[in-house]
Every structure is written in C-alpha cells, then in structure tokens.
C-alpha cells in the first residue's frame, strides 16, 4: 500500500466491502491540514469581471471589440476592501473566462486589459489589494479560449503551449496564489 492510501483523508474500499463496512471506513476519515486550512476560509469572494460586464451578457464568444471594455474608474483595491470588510478571507478572480480576454499584462495575446487600460494590470492591482487586506488570492483561468479558437489555434499542440504560458505568467508574476480554478 502506498503512502497516499495510508493517509487519514483517503478511504480505500475493497470491491468486496459491504455497505456497512464502507460506512464504517468513511466515518473515520480525517481531513489533511491543508484541507482544514481551506475549509476554515469559509467565506470566499468570486469576482467575475470582464468586457461582458459592460455587454450585459454572462459569456462572451471571443469576438468582443476592445471598445466593449470601458471602465470609467477601475478601483480594484476597493473590491478587496469591500470583500475583506464583509468577512471574506480570499478572492478568486476570473483572470480569463471563455471569451479569452486576459485581465493581466500577458505576453501571449493583445486581447487583454493591458492594451485597453494603458498598461494597467488588473491582476497586479488585485494581488496588491488582497495582500493589503490580508486576503488569499485565487485565480480562475479558463482553458476554453473562444478568441484563440477563432485564430486557428484550437486543437493544435500550440494551444497547449499558449495556455501553459498564461498559467505560468499568473503563477509566477503575482506572488502567492492560493487557489487555481480551471473551467471549460
């Protein structure tokens, strides 16, 4: 039996186990320290902000015009202050949703907030706001990128490199990232 199977947060069932035996095993599961730490966060903010905030649609399709994204006064640290005062211990930010619009200064595409906001890095502002408010930072990064599909990069291996480059940027340029969400 390997170490993972012996861990107190793992239950291993034998195919011959009865329901009663399975219930008895499951009743003795203990969460790992990392799992306990995550559960103690209890209240986490999930911020979904993108060009579609201004289009009144839930999802974009990757063909949005840069002119669709027009925040009059973007105050990302204010988001963090409000969430912190509400008792949230972490914020998860949609750095890129399915439309492919990147909310950080990326080298992978010009379909980003950087090209529209004159170099302002929304992700950097969020990271600083979370740090200033003693909150954890989570990143939502959609592997499904409808904007790149339109450019012919969809099922090709090049897309994997493109996506991994984005993930690398987010995990190395913004300090500690406590959680990563993939969706798509």
Spans of model-derived segments:
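Mature catalytic domains of secreted/periplasmic carbohydrate-active enzymes
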Residues: 1-184
């Amino acid at each position: 039996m390997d170490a993972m199977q012996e861990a107190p947060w793992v239950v291993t069932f034998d195919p011959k186990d009865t329901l009663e035996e399975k219930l008895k095993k499951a009743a003795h599961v203990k969460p790992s320290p990392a799992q306990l730490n995550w559960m103690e966060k209890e209240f986490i903010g999930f911020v979904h902000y993108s060009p579609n905030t201004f289009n009144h649609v839930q999802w974009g399709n990757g063909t949005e015009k840069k002119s669709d994204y027009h925040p009059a006064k973007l105050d990302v640290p204010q988001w963090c202050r409000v969430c912190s005062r509400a008792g949230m211990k972490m914020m998860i930010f949609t750095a890129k949703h399915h439309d492919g619009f990147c909310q950080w200064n990326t080298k992978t595409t010009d379909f980003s907030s950087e090209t529209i906001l004159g170099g302002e890095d929304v992700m950097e502002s969020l990271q600083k706001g979370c740090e200033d408010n003693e909150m954890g930072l989570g990143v939502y990064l959609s592997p499904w990128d409808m904007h790149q599909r339109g450019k012919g990069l969809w099922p090709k291996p090049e897309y994997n490199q493109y996506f991994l480059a984005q993930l690398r940027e987010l995990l190395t340029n913004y300090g500690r990232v406590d959680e990563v969400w993939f969706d798509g």
